Amino acid sequence: MAITRWFFSTNHKDIGTLYLVFGAWAGMVGTALSLLIRAELSQPGALLGDDQIYNVIVTAHAFVMIFFMVMPLMIGGFGNWLIPLMIGAPDMAFPRMNNMSFWLLPPSFLLLLASSGVEAGAGTGWTLYPPLAGNLAHAGASVDLTIFSLHLAGISSILGAINFITTIINMKPPAISQYQTPLFVWAVLITAVLLLLSLPVLAAGITMLLTDRNLNTSFFDPAGGGDPILYQHLFWFFGHPEVYILILPGFGMISHIVAYYSGKKEPFGYMGMVWAMMAIGLLGFIVWAHHMFTVGMDVDTRAYFTSATMIIAIPTGVKVFSWLATLHGGSIKWETPLLWALGFIFLFTVGGLTGIVLANSSLDIVLHDTYYVVAHFHYVLSMGAVFAIMAAFVHWFPLFTGYTLHDTWTKIHFGVMFVGVNLTFFPQHFLGLAGMPRRYSDYPDAYTLWNTVSSIGSLISLMAVIMFLFILWEAFAAKREVMAVEMTMTNVEWLHGCPPPYHTFEEPAFVQIQTR
């Protein structure tokens, strides 16, 4: 029974649960790797060994957090669970392909871990730039295994994207237009389109790198007429949309949570929110070279990428102020998901502001590859994506399980986590402005103070992670069942009770459209 249910599942709820469990587990691995990094940097001098092993840990930390934590949780977990419920579909459009999308991830994860176990590991950073990722600087199978791992994760995401696009467009009731679907549905739709358009470019780039390493081609080798800068263009044409893929589903979840706990029946400016997400999705594809301001592009090219990058701040601002407008005048229920959502709005905005700073090509020449960049993207990921995941988890946990989390404990957990991540990443702005470079395992004594503070912050975050595991255990042990759900008419996913039956919407939903 367990084997047929969990290994061969074609049920969106079960596959969503598999994604949530896998993502949580990978999150533990990624957190462990990050704590190794912060332990190494807690004081000057070596702890783990040389820079190679350090960079292997950094690289693995990035890949694990991006491909095996954030994406499986947001898109695979919440997407699978909520989207069919929100549009009244009996399941995903391609339920068996959905199962395959999930089961490609554990082998992919295995290949990534294997890459660290053979030879010297892949100490390239998650960007895998040649010539460092070439077969001279990284002889052996490590980088090849990493590339195969990325191939599997990429296929998984492409199949998932096809599935979500088909489901969202074709499986809603005929009477409902796309502009009547909830914002989370829109967010995942736009995310899926971004995945579908960007991942093939990454696949091309890393396949060319694979043949450069093993088949003696010279796509990225100047000796044979190639150019390593070509790889950077291919990688970042994927890499920049990828960072929007990581945050867009979070935008959708935050919209739902802010509206729900403000006592509003809809978020402020629904159409503005949709168009803002579409604008972010489009602009995300035409700003990639802002990651390459230091490789010697023309001044007019740099001017274009600076301006285009700054334009993204406009739709992002539309979203931030719409969330604040949703809160305005509401009867606010100060429950934990709202705390996570407010933390998201504030800290994501801070991360966005440092992003505007980095968009200036002149300033980026100085700040590129310093801890200022690390601080910037960890504010939008570690306090944007992760806070959105936590908000969504605490909010929808009763829907998934039928049990409620302990109210006071989750609030304490939020407080500890909030202090921990800010103490970890805020000082890194100072280190970056003082010129401390990224991806080095050691540093001059002058940088000791803020590195020590940052590492203490990481230990506080670790306490929060352990506290979260306790909260989960407590909820399943206490078994406080959900009594009643409010506002089901504007939050359709709750309509079937907590937890919903194994099969929902087995016959088409009846939708009555009001005509004035």
From Swiss-Prot:
O2 binds at Y244. It catalyses: 4 Fe(II)-[cytochrome c] + O2 + 8 H(+)(in) = 4 Fe(III)-[cytochrome c] + 2 H2O + 4 H(+)(out). Its EC number is 7.1.1.9. Fe(II)-heme a binds at H61, H378. Residues 1-11, 87-94, 171-182, 262-269, 328-335, 401-406, 479-516 are mitochondrial matrix. Pathway: Energy metabolism; oxidative phosphorylation. Residues 41-50, 118-140, 213-227, 287-298, 358-370, 434-446 are mitochondrial intermembrane. Mg(2+) binds at H368, D369. GO terms for cellular component: mitochondrial inner membrane; respiratory chain complex IV. Component of the cytochrome c oxidase, the last enzyme in the mitochondrial electron transport chain which drives oxidative phosphorylation. The respiratory chain contains 3 multisubunit complexes succinate dehydrogenase (complex II, CII), ubiquinol-cytochrome c oxidoreductase (cytochrome b-c1 complex, complex III, CIII) and cytochrome c oxidase (complex IV, CIV), that cooperate to transfer electrons derived from NADH and succinate to molecular oxygen, creating an electrochemical gradient over the inner membrane that drives transmembrane transport and the ATP synthase. Na(+) binds at E40, G45, S441. Component of the cytochrome c oxidase (complex IV, CIV), a multisubunit enzyme composed of 14 subunits. The complex is composed of a catalytic core of 3 subunits MT-CO1, MT-CO2 and MT-CO3, encoded in the mitochondrial DNA, and 11 supernumerary subunits COX4I, COX5A, COX5B, COX6A, COX6B, COX6C, COX7A, COX7B, COX7C, COX8 and NDUFA4, which are encoded in the nuclear genome. GO terms for biological process: electron transport coupled proton transport; mitochondrial electron transport, cytochrome c to oxygen. Cu cation binds at H240, H290, H291. CDD domains: Cyt_c_Oxidase_I. The gene is mt-co1. This is Cytochrome c oxidase subunit 1. There is a cross-link at H240-Y244 (1'-histidyl-3'-tyrosine (His-Tyr)). The chain crosses the membrane at residues 12-40, 51-86, 95-117, 141-170, 183-212, 228-261, 270-286, 299-327, 336-357, 371-400, 407-433, 447-478. Binds 2 heme A groups non-covalently per subunit. Binds a copper B center. GO terms for molecular function: cytochrome-c oxidase activity; heme binding; metal ion binding. It is an enzyme of class 7 (translocase). It is found in: Mitochondrion inner membrane. Belongs to the heme-copper respiratory oxidase family. Keywords: Calcium, Copper, Electron transport, Heme, Iron, Magnesium, Membrane, Metal-binding, Mitochondrion, Mitochondrion inner membrane, Respiratory chain, Sodium, Translocase, Transmembrane, Transmembrane helix, Transport. Heme a3 binds at H376. PANTHER family: CYTOCHROME C OXIDASE SUBUNIT 1 (PTHR10422:SF18).
